[in-house]
Amino acid sequence: IIVCPDGDVTSWYFDSPIDKKMRYETYLFKELVESIDNTYNTIAEKSGRAITGLSMGGHGAFYLAFRHQEVWGAAGSMSGGVDIRPFPKNWDLSKRLGDYAIYKENWENNTVINMVHLLKGDDLKLIFDCGVDDFFFDANKRLHTKLLERNIPHDYTERPGGHSWDYWANSIKYQLLFFNDYFAY
């Protein structure tokens, strides 16, 4: 079963500490998963679930998987915004987290690159990639380095390309192969 929930363009998949109506983390990791498990014949445990996304959804997939390793056994990100701090004026982030100068703690606590400490060994299978011409490239490379420093196994790929549907049309093939192998075990 593949489920593609709407990320509302700028939800960033967390529960906003500023806008209490933005409860995407709760919706996705709790309400949606429970609804799918109650409606369909699923493997209702982490070994039967994976999450992935692109761009904001790549941030969201890793954010949710890092924070809720009891829900997902594998996670992927394509061109993910894995460090949102360099972009305080973009994509409604200040509406979700508050002004960076005032609410720096919100930004530090809700960016994927600062959540690597939550990972333990190879308990969560990870795949991510980014095009070398993508504005998120540097952040993905830094995440890769942090994972290496902590000896967290992961698949990471850099390829030609930017932040585009052409790039993701190619990237998704590798993600699907990775998840197919994950579910085969």
Give residue ranges: language-model regions:
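Non-catalytic cap/lid and distal C-terminal segments of serine-dependent acyl enzymes
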Residues: 1-185
